[in-house]
Amino acid sequence: MAKVEVCNMSGEKVSEIDLADEIFGVEVKGSVLHEVVVMQLANRRAGTVCVKNRSDVRGSTRKLYRQKGTGRARKGDIKSPVLRGGGVVFGPHPRDYSYKVPKKVRKAALKMALSSKLADNSLKVVDNMDLPEIKTKAFAEAMAAMGVDTALIVTTGEEKNLELSARNVKGVKVMPTAGLNVYDILKYGNLILAQGAIEAIEGRLL
């Protein structure tokens, strides 16, 4: 088991905690992380893009002029894709981009993402993240004391004061343990876990 320092919001060490090797000490495979991140991004796509084909464009279906004898190139109706304002050929239409990778792969990727943060010394554990009041300045000072600029902060539950204080700070995201995912772990430079969140993560992944 890896030992990690537990600090307070002032960056001072208060204790140590053991992290399970089955979650925070697994071999990191880039291909697995890539597979899950691509899935997450695909699932976030709205899929609402839509263009008009020649049957959707408003206009007459009358042939513009006769087929032969004019000396000009042959043309159909005004909605033809070769004309300005005509329909689009094989254009995008609303569709669902979401898909799933196996549950075991998603679970393994989450363990790998957590392990990568520990291996890079980018994982910090904080004993208590509860702020007495909503104050962005106080939050920014706490981040500076911990030596962190960008971070994903994972709380045990809803920390309203913390969420509102961090809302306007660039490069910081606060989320409860239930929302923990591979993409957000990898996106932010550091991972800050509430001490109570570790128990929830171990309960979810062990």
Curated annotation (Swiss-Prot):
Transmembrane segments annotated in the record for this chain: none
A Pfam family reported for this protein in Swiss-Prot or TrEMBL: Ribosomal_L4
Keyword Ribonucleoprotein carried by entry: yes
Cellular-component GO terms for this entry: ribonucleoprotein complex; ribosome
Single GO MF descriptor: rRNA binding
Alphabetized UniProt keyword annotations: Ribonucleoprotein, Ribosomal protein, RNA-binding, rRNA-binding
Single GO BP term: translation
Family matches, as HAMAP family: Ribosomal_uL4_B
PANTHER family: 50S RIBOSOMAL PROTEIN L4 (PTHR10746), LARGE RIBOSOMAL SUBUNIT PROTEIN UL4M (PTHR10746:SF6)
Oligomeric form and interacting partners: Part of the 50S ribosomal subunit.
Record family assignment: Belongs to the universal ribosomal protein uL4 family.
Functional description taken from the UniProt entry: One of the primary rRNA binding proteins, this protein initially binds near the 5'-end of the 23S rRNA. It is important during the early stages of 50S assembly. It makes multiple contacts with different domains of the 23S rRNA in the assembled 50S subunit and ribosome. Forms part of the polypeptide exit tunnel.
Entry protein name: Large ribosomal subunit protein uL4
